Amino acid sequence: DLHPRVRRQRQMCIRDSTGGIQTTGNYMGRARTPEQLMADMEEAMRLMPGTAKLNIHASYAIFAPGEFADRDALEPKHFAKWVEFAKKHHMGIDFNPTFFSHEKVKDGQTLSSPDEETRRFWINHGKACIRISEYFAKETGVPCVMNIWTGDGFKDVPADRMGPRMRYKDSIEQILSEPYDHNLVKPCVESKVFGIGVESYTVGSAEFTLSFAALHDGCMPLMDNGHYHPLEYVSDKIPAMLCFYPEFALHITRGVRWDSDHVLILDDETKEMAKEIVRDNALDRVYMALDYFDASINRVSALATGFRSWQKALLIALCTPNAMLKALQDTNQMSKLMVMNEAVKMLPIGEIWDEYLRREGVVDDLHFYDEIEKYENEVLEKRN
């Protein structure tokens, strides 16, 4: 008994995604209801060692039968079932306003729109999300990171680059003027170099978001390692950021040639990002979120594989003799540093990983997919 506007907005999120976002594939078993999505999450978490944190979008609001609230009128009650789910699994919740896939995205613009009615709608959406984020933090007892990202931009060369950014700046400042407990809500601003349909200009560039966060107390920058030129490495940016920001956030993903959001695997850049966080003693300063989607493969497998890959990267970083390697660098023993770096790559990390899984009561890598197949056969296939 979905309200017609709820149904239409869900269809827009699935079929008409805007803001340069794109996913490909149509693998069996896509969740079609909040209950199905929660079931898939529970199955994925069963395969994840350690502690997870839920991260949801404003578009995941759950309405009572026949109920509807547009994004500028969302309330905590529309996310009560997510809080119930998080409490059941002893998790906190991070939150994202959804500034895309909506009929009030005008000419590809939201917070930077020259149309004041459009901009006001999206400012009010951001303010509503501040209130919802504080609700999450109070209910779960865990601070809520609220990430502001929009796909605002232009497909071709703009005549005015500064005007949209000044409007964007004013809009975010108005959102952050909403009263909230700074110990409970951690707002951040995320940049992007380009997206499909906004190839020539993105309002929220890296320089914009870094500068905004630097000049606004309590607002963090967020770096997504898929949101830069392919030859830029977030692993190199992490220590630079740590020199100036007490805290910041990451979206950890895997871009293939562009911001493709492939499922995270244990590749070189993933390992390097984890190493920088660990070797710089920044595990308590960096909020780490995983950000990927691939509709061409089993979605439960994607969730769990990416999570396990990041856990492996952190384990490798924690087992690396960082103090010794730093000492070699500081004494200019670069040949020995190269040799030792290569030696570290052959340390028996796999045995430590297997023991960690055993202690967490989680299936090992060799039998991991057996559980995925079982769930696919018993649950996912029946959804089609």
Located regions from the model:
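Histidine-acidic metal/acid-base catalytic patches
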Residues: 131-139, 158, 166-184, 201-206, ...
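Non-cysteine beta-strand/loop elements that form the S-adenosyl-L-methionine
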Residues: 11, 15, 95-98, 245-253
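Active-site acidic/histidine proton-transfer and metal-coordination neighborhood
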Residues: 75-216, 220, 324, 342-344
